[in-house]
Amino acid sequence: MNILGIETSCDETSAAVLKNGLVASNIISSQLCHSEFGGVVPELASREHDRMVVTVVEAALNAANIKKTELDFIAATAGPGLIGAVLVGLSFGQALGFSLGKPFIPINHIDAHIFSSFINDGTQHTFPAFPFVSLTVSGGHTMLCLVHDDLRIEPLGSTIDDAAGEAFDKTGKMLGLNYPAGPVIDKLAQTGDPNFHQFPQALTAQSKTGNDYKANLDFSFSGLKTSVLRYLSGQKPEFIQAHLNDICASIQEAITSVLVRKTILAAEQSGVRTISVTGGVSANSELRRKFEAASKAHGFSLHIPKPVYSTDNAAMIATLAHLKAERGLIEPCAYNAPAFAGYEKMKVFRAR
């Protein structure tokens, strides 16, 4: 079974080919034009996707040594994401499927991150056992869910305001760091003191039902951003520069600690022994270290994709399409892109 995956939800134009579940190619073109603006400009993103999508798809097919006519399925991100950006890949994928008479599978971008722990490029030997608790954490999303064998996703908690990745980027911008600031903070924090300043961790209280205590599995990072802003406004520029690494480490500590703590609580409350951590922020070295230590201490099986599969990529789109096709979870239908897709079922579009 040969599947072409296409990803254009934000600022990466990516295409990948899976051959019988194995990654044969995964081409990613990152848009560098947004760095001068300190964030992604939607109109620029759409135009860059439109300019690059044909080139990237052709590169993926060539790298996999496969012809378009040999494809069995074509899949593309259908939301959520920047609506103009999503429409580029979605429209291209549908048109390609129609022209070839191949089935098209629209893929929920968040779901693709959740199942990115199943990406197989030949080097992975173990994959999450169902059911498992998944933490998906990126610039636009922070959520916990319970994942079942039929690919059903049961939400457990999510951010009530800002995503963890956004907290990294916005606090980094306050510090004068380049966009995206997450990787920069990660690097600077490695030589900083995480206890230099204690920034707040929100929604950590537990509620009592009868004789049982239940953790709040939602997240909030808007208060952290405000706290960092107030802290920095009270310091002299010389002080901030002298302690930049320590401040970065303290910010990273506040974000990563609450992510790990709530994921462990979610697994314990759900009664599962397997945890998966995905999304762009899962590439953070301190988050990985904390999860490895916590999983070992609590006896959980931990699965985190390689960094190249943590950020937006088409291999995860094709992988989820493969899992759906294996289970027969595709049906003929037309599909359009919503700006926010939530968890509604996304079906297959088949050329008639």
UniProtKB/Swiss-Prot annotation:
Binding residue positions for substrate: T136, V137, S138, G139, G140, D169, G182, D186, N284
SUPFAM superfamilies: Actin-like ATPase domain
Reaction catalysis annotation: L-threonylcarbamoyladenylate + adenosine(37) in tRNA = N(6)-L-threonylcarbamoyladenosine(37) in tRNA + AMP + H(+)
UniProt GO cellular component terms: cytoplasm
Keywords (A to Z) from UniProt: Acyltransferase, Cytoplasm, Iron, Metal-binding, Transferase, tRNA processing
Any single GO BP term: tRNA threonylcarbamoyladenosine modification
Cofactor(s) required, per the database record: Fe(2+)
GO molecular function: iron ion binding; N(6)-L-threonylcarbamoyladenine synthase activity
One Pfam family this sequence matches: TsaD
Main subcellular location of this protein, as a coarse class: cytoplasm
Chain residues that bind Fe cation: H109, H113, D312
Cellular localisation: Cytoplasm
Cofactor binding remark: Binds 1 Fe(2+) ion per subunit.
EC id: 2.3.1.234
Its job: Required for the formation of a threonylcarbamoyl group on adenosine at position 37 (t(6)A37) in tRNAs that read codons beginning with adenine. Is involved in the transfer of the threonylcarbamoyl moiety of threonylcarbamoyl-AMP (TC-AMP) to the N6 group of A37, together with TsaE and TsaB. TsaD likely plays a direct catalytic role in this reaction.
Family: Belongs to the KAE1 / TsaD family.
PANTHER family recorded: TRNA N6-ADENOSINE THREONYLCARBAMOYLTRANSFERASE, TRNA N6-ADENOSINE THREONYLCARBAMOYLTRANSFERASE, MITOCHONDRIAL
Protein name: tRNA N6-adenosine threonylcarbamoyltransferase
Gene: tsaD
